A protein has these predicted regions:
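Residues that line or immediately flank small-molecule/substrate-binding pockets and catalytic motifs
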Residues: 8, 128, 166
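Short helix-loop boundary/capping segments at the starts of domains
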Residues: 10, 34, 89-93
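Hydrophobic h-region of N-terminal signal peptides that target proteins for export
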Residues: 10-18
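Hydrophobic residues in beta-strands of the RecA-like P-loop NTPase core, especially within AAA+ ATPase
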Residues: 28-29
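Extracytoplasmic mature domains of secreted/periplasmic and thylakoid-lumen proteins
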Residues: 95-151
């Protein structure tokens, strides 16, 4: 099973470096195991058609599929840093490592190889740009929590397009010391920072390199869950669309684009099934954007969809040989989205949570 992971990586290296595919999409569903996918398809079938069965996602209809184990070099249960490193480099490492080996030496990533081969490169996510999975493609640090240091690696990689919720520690080092803001550093390195989809459209034409994050004041750690989304919120599909737009403008030698559905994992940590299924569907919507591009360039495009690991041990079944997935249609917010505005200490004496 270890060979399957390496095979995936070496296939990517081959198509990027040897010109077998001009355009490469690498979608990663963080925490997305088999049951997260199956559950989403069953959930869709019951909600859309009122029947037991599956309503297929686009990516489950792709012609080639396989399975792989996910243990790291040091742990039976990996984390996103070690798993992201494996997906980015083809090498196993210790938990918390960002594209360094067990001796803490940097390992070259497939994105870096693509850049050296003359491709444009994009690294995107629905969580923060300095989070473990996206970081594994452009940074080399001994600990995933070194957010400031990871952000400093971003301009060193010199990739063309980055996108996500924002940056977690833009002015604070790993040892909690005050540091210069990363944003002027990005700008000095030639990056244009766009805040929101409309700002991207206004700035992209004149930008040489782009960092797309959420609007000022939004939570920098992530995009909102799909189930909580408001009209003006940035989406993973918009990020994918923007990345394609940016990476194909000007001299077009092809691109390598990594897109992470990072909050599948977060919803699984919360044991929030309705939010999980909505997040898987949301990543599928981003894959549809790539698929529309593929239909215009079918002989030049490769789309790979994978996961770094499964989260939560989700089980589809009960002791009564039944699932009540339709009950989840009544959930209108994530557990996280509901808990933030609800504070039991602020309820008036005559109120209950049902009143809010």
């Amino acid at each position: 099973m270890k060979k399957l992971v390496y095979t995936l990586f070496f296939v990517l290296i081959s198509v990027v470096a040897n010109g077998q595919a001009k355009y490469v999409f690498y979608f990663i569903g963080d925490g997305m195991g088999v049951n997260q996918v199956n559950g989403t398809e069953m959930f869709q079938a019951e909600l859309q058609n009122g029947r037991i069965g599956v309503e297929p996602l686009l990516f489950t209809q792709f012609p080639v599929a396989t399975m792989a184990t996910t243990f790291s070099a040091t742990n039976s249960v990996t984390d996103s840093a070690a798993a992201g490193t494996a997906l980015a480099t083809g090498k196993k490492t210790y938990n918390h490592a960002i594209s360094v080996n067990e001796e803490k030496n940097a390992i070259q990533t497939v994105a870096e190889k693509a850049k050296k081969a003359g491709k444009k490169v994009g690294v995107t996510t629905s969580v923060s740009v300095d989070h473990a999975t996206p970081a594994a493609f452009y940074a080399h640090q001994p600990d995933r929590n070194m957010y400031y240091e990871i952000a400093l690696d971003l301009p060193k990689a010199n990739f063309d397009f980055y996108a996500g919720g924002g940056f977690l520690k833009p002015t604070t080092t790993f040892d909690n010391k005050k540091a210069p803001s990363i944003f002027p550093i990005f700008e000095e390195a030639g990056y244009t920072v766009a805040r929101g989809y409309n700002d991207y459209k206004a700035k992209s034409q004149n930008a040489e390199k782009m960092i797309l994050i959420q609007e000022e004041g939004a939570n920098p750690s992530c995009l909102p869950y799909a189930i909580d989304r408001k009209d003006n919120d940035l989406t993973l599909a918009q990020i994918t669309e923007s990345a394609i737009d940016f990476l194909t403008k000007g001299k077009n030698k092809g691109f390598f684009l990594m897109v992470e559905g990072g909050k599948i994992d977060w919803a699984c940590h919360a044991n929030d099934a309705a939010t999980v299924f909505n997040e898987v569907k949301d990543m599928d919507n981003a894959i549809k954007v790539a698929y529309e591009f593929y239909k215009k360039h079918p002989k030049e495009t490769l789309i790979v969809v994978t996961a770094d690991h499964e989260t939560g041990g989700i089980v589809l079944g009960t002791g009564k040989y039944a699932l009540n997935l339709k009950a989840l249609q009544h959930q209108k917010h994530s557990a996280d989205g509901l808990s933030k505005p609800v504070s039991y200490t602020h309820l008036r004496a005559h109120e209950t949570c049902a009143d809010l």
